[in-house]
Amino acid sequence: MTSSLPSKPIHTIELAPATRLIRVTEVMAIVGLARPTIYKLMSQPESGFPQAVKLTDSTARGAPVAWVLSEVLDWTHARIAARDRVAA
């Protein structure tokens, strides 16, 4: 009988940036912004900052959310590209 379980323990499986969810502390470390600034950017569509993904069906304030790593990295790269266009 074959098993459909992964051959590695789940904590050692690496996820692609497009599927990996990260919590706000990791977002803060990547973009160098404070939590309130991140949420402010999310409320401003023109900022282009990625929206969080709800991790539960809860509508309560403080319900768990996460961001898609690739979207955060794309936003960061876009900020760098914007800087480079201005400098050129």
PLM region spans:
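Polyanion-binding surface elements
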Residues: 2, 7-44, 73-74, 78
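General helical structural elements
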Residues: 24-27, 39, 58, 83, ...
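Major-groove DNA-recognition helix of helix-turn-helix-type DNA-binding domains
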Residues: 30-65
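A short, Lys/Arg-enriched interface patch at domain edges and termini
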Residues: 65-88
